[in-house]
Every structure is written in structure tokens, then in C-alpha cells.
Amino acid sequence: MTDNVLLEAKNVTIRFGGLTAVSNFNLSIRGHELVGLIGPNGAGKTTIFNMLTGVYKPTEGEIRIGGEPTTEMKPYQITARGVARTFQNIRLFKELTVLDNVKIGGHIHYQYSGLAAVLHTNRFYEAEQRAESEALGLLEIFGLRSRANALAKNLPYGDQRRLEIARALAARPKLLLLDEPAAGLNTGETLALMDKIHESRDKFQVAVLLIEHNMELVMGICERIIVLSFGKTIAEGRPEQIRANPTVIEAYLGEPAEAAGL
């Protein structure tokens, strides 16, 4: 493994009872890549995300972060090593403010004792000030600073999507996993999101692995695409290669490329 490999999955398989959800999956993420993971519903995409983040443990194979096996790691330990994610179904702290949601995302970098918090020590105040400053900076990037004190539940749906990405970036990840970030967004919101993903990748020097059904977004921003069908990888390559791959069109789309937006 070379030094710039952030995450690697080797021959990863997971079974639930008699069902093989993912079979012999391989993945290597380097540097500041922007990689798409696509396939029909039930292909195993979110299951892969759950394995990469420690929610599920592979039945076979191995996942490494920075060369270190994740077999014994808890999800929070994987986050601490630089992997953050969003979810297909938005998971915000709806009763907290927009600002507090982002601050929570970065809490692993602002550790202080419970006693320090109770006594309001200088260390506590300094950590809180840094957390707020960084959180406000992220909200500025995602156009949410003016809503910092609003409750997360009161944001429009598209803003909640952006807030979830901002919260994930607060963890200062080396690799950001986005699970259907454009789900439920209209065309204008999707195009704006594409710009923000690119901007975030460049500004924070973070690699991005995203699951998405919106082919315009995937083909427009991903440098490499992996295609799954029934838990198996059926193709991998650049967008133009995937767009022209008849196996992908048949297995994933089941319709002519033009009709599918490819």
C-alpha cells in the first residue's frame, strides 16, 4: 500500500444469515479523489458505507484506514481517524440550533473534562470559542450563517441537507462519505450542491466518496465511478467509460443511455 492511500477495502464480503449483501468488494481511495458509488436500490451501497464506518463488520475481507485495520475499531474511533459521513435519511439534532449541530460535529477536536465545563475554566472557554468560530466558518461556506440560531427542524429540506454536510466537515475528515446528498433536491439545489462539494473538496483537501442516484451529479463531479449490482462490482472507471458501458446500462439502468441521462 502506498503512503497516500486513505482507505482500502480488500475482498470484503458481508452476509446477513443466508443473504450475501456485498461480495468480494475492493476499494482504494487516495489523496483528494472524488469517487462515485452507484447502483440500483438494494445493490449494497449503504451497506458498504456502514462497513467503512464500523457500523457493520465484514464477514470476510479487511478494511484499512491509513494502513491500520479497522476490525477492532468502534465507529467513533474510525471518525477520529478521519472518516466522516452523512446519511440517506437526514439525521440532524432537530431541536438544537444550526450552529450547535455543526459544533457537535467537531467535538472530538475540542476535548475538555466535565469538571472544566462545570467550572468554566479557561480551557473550556477557549475550546468553545474555537468550536464556534470553525462552525460559523462552515455555515458561511454553505450559505447558512444567517440561520445559525434557528432550530435545525425549521430549516427547509435543502438547507438541512447542506447542514448535514457542514456538520460532517466539522470533524475535519480526510475522507467524507456522502450518502445520496442530492436526494429530494430540485435541479437548482442539486447544481448548487455540486459546486459546494467541489469547493469543500478543494478547500479542505478532503477525499469524497458519494452514493447518488442523480446521474447528472455523479457524471458531473466524480473522477472515478464504481458500479454495483446485487452486491458485486460490475464496472469501474471514468465517467465517460461508465456512460458507454453496456453492462452498466443494462444491469443498473435497464434502459437506453439517452433515456437514463447518461
Residue ranges and their predicted role:
Residues T2-L262:
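Glycine-rich phosphate-binding loops of nucleotide-dependent enzymes
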